[in-house]
């Protein structure tokens, strides 16, 4: 029998069956084309999930299309190194919902922030402290072939 707590196997020391998707292979967004920010401070208790919003501003001269499942899922990063240390580890519905943003306009996209640890050294939940989050945006209507770009690291406070 395989048990998983959050994103990590139980008992500790076993190999995880599935590796979380972290968006590590995506390039960074061009800040001259797309600006992103949190819609207010992001504060969540360790071991819990926060539903927040990502503000996305289209600085280009063409419509921006972002493929989502109704939200974008962030990963938690160490702000000093950029290393992904956690995020959301549960199941999600996967409908294809395209967010369209006209040139020069902005929109709020729901943002899912989980605190399950992806690092055995941190335990099963990312501990309290000042962390960062970033999200990967799929820039086009086809999740399989559209380019993926990462947001800059944004501040996250995790409380006990």
Question: How should each PLM-predicted stretch be described?
Answer:
Residues 1-31:
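A eukaryote-biased signal for short, well-structured alpha-helical docking elements
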Residues 11-14, 43, 157:
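Intrinsically disordered, low-complexity segments enriched in proline/serine/threonine
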Residues 14-16, 27-31, 48-51, 72-73, ...:
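Short amphipathic alpha-helical segments, especially helix-boundary/capping motifs
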Residues 19-49:
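N-terminal edge beta-strand
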Residues 27, 37, 57-59, 94, ...:
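Preference for short coil/turn "hinge" residues that link or interrupt alpha-helices
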Residues 34-43, 57-67, 71:
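Short, charge-rich amphipathic segments
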Residues 50-58:
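Short, well-ordered beta-strand segments enriched in hydrophobic/aromatic residues
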Residues 61-160:
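Extended, well-structured beta-strand/loop surface patches
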């Amino acid at each position: 029998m395989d048990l998983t707590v959050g994103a990590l196997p139980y008992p500790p020391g076993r190999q995880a069956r599935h590796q979380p998707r972290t968006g590590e292979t995506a390039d960074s967004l061009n800040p001259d084309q797309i600006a992103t920010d949190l819609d207010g401070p992001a504060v969540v208790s360790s071991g819990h999930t926060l539903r927040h919003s990502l503000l996305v501003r289209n600085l280009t001269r063409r419509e921006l299309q972002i493929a989502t499942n109704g939200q974008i899922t962030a990963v938690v990063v160490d702000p000093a190194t950029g290393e992904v240390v956690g995020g959301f580890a549960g199941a999600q519905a996967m409908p294809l919902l395209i967010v369209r943003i006209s040139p020069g306009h902005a929109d709020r996209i729901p943002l899912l922030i989980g605190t399950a640890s992806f690092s055995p050294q941190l335990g099963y939940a990312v501990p309290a402290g000042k962390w960062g989050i970033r999200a990967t945006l799929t820039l086009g209507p086809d999740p399989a072939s559209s380019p993926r770009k990462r947001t800059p690291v944004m501040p996250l406070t995790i409380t006990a």
